[in-house]
Amino acid sequence: TGVVVVFLEIGNEVKIVGDIYEAINEGVRQGYKEGYLRKSIVNHPFNRVNTKDNTPAIIHTKLVSGDKIKLKIASKGGGSENMSKVTMLTPAEGIEGVKKLVLDTIFNAGGRPCPPIIVGIGIGGNLEKSALLAKEAILRDLDDESDDDIINKLEKELYDEINELGVGPVGVGGKTTCLAVKINFYPMHIASLPVGINIQCHSSRHIEVIL
């Protein structure tokens, strides 16, 4: 179920014949039909008519060097997505401000994102970049640690502190609220500290394909 999100990287030596976006959407149509998956996409914010094939996918494209195409594909559920957010902090709020924002967000979400959860955090860039950083963060391997000392320490601290909140599996209490915290970051404006928080439920359905 869920909306299909694709991070598409196209090498600059790759020649594509046809519409790659339509090819991706056709793959979604076939996959959801053949896999008997629930179709979750509606066509309009207010009319809300189901498209009946789970398209269109949300596709983020990046041009890179090389002769390969890489697709990171996720089926992102609505319950956890609804608990996600982007906040523009001030630089003065710093690490403690980020921690407070994340902990408040997870605590207030309770059982709605179907914990135990994976927490993706994007820090920096601007409003939309922080959201994309957070989305990509939830696709990282659970044992993938940041090679930045400050970020690595923050990931571990937040992991421990989230699990001390007592939300627990499905929100009924316990010590396992969070399976992982992953943080991606990017340079930003001197006056800004954008923070995106993307929450993934325990059913983390994603795959990476290289063509």
Q: What are these language model-derived features?
A:
Residues 1-211:
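Non-transmembrane, aqueous-exposed alpha-helical and coiled segments at domain scale
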